[in-house]
């Protein structure tokens, strides 16, 4: 399970260092794609295969399904970790997430998210102010 929040910076080659605590679980080959809220999602291969299977089972005759699947898969890239735990983030994903240099890497259970520091700060401030309200709404989902 991926947990925690880490501050990192991209190097001049666009490489990011994956936190040591995440490396074993994410593996040396993993998938990055456009996430929700303008961040980047990273998935271990096994989790990616589960998501891929679920998305393939959706009815492609629905326009919203086609749009989501196109966006999600077209932005995806299979990435590798080098011996130092670094991986090059593709330019299209960096541009999508507004990442120049400084990033926040967070663990979100089954995936890792990479945020520009600025966007994470803004998101986090807004989420903190409504955290209790969100928690109350989750009761409806049985949580």
From Swiss-Prot:
Q: Does the keyword Translocase apply?
A: no
Q: What keywords are annotated for this sequence in UniProt?
A: Cytoplasm, DNA-binding, Repeat, Transcription, Transcription regulation
> One MF term from GO for this chain?
transcription cis-regulatory region binding
User: So which domain of life are we looking at?
Assistant: Bacteria
Give one Pfam family, short name only: MraZ
Q: Which GO terms describe its cellular component?
A: cytoplasm; nucleoid
Q: Which family does it belong to?
A: Belongs to the MraZ family.
Task: Please state what the protein is called.
Answer: Transcriptional regulator MraZ
């Amino acid at each position: 399970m991926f947990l925690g929040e880490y501050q990192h910076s991209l190097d001049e080659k666009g490489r990011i260092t994956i936190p040591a605590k995440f490396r074993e679980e994410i593996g040396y080959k993993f998938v990055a794609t456009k996430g929700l809220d303008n961040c980047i999602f990273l998935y271990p291969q096994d989790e990616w295969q589960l998501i891929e299977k679920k998305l393939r089972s959706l009815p492609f005759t629905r326009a919203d399904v086609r749009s989501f699947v196109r966006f999600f898969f077209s932005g995806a890239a299979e990435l590798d970790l080098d011996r130092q735990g670094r991986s090059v983030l593709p330019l299209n994903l960096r541009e999508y997430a507004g990442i120049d240099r400084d990033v926040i890497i967070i663990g979100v259970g089954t995936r890792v998210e990479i945020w520009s520091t600025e966007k994470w700060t803004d998101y986090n401030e807004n989420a903190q102010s409504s955290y209790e309200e969100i928690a109350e709404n989750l009761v409806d989902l049985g949580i």
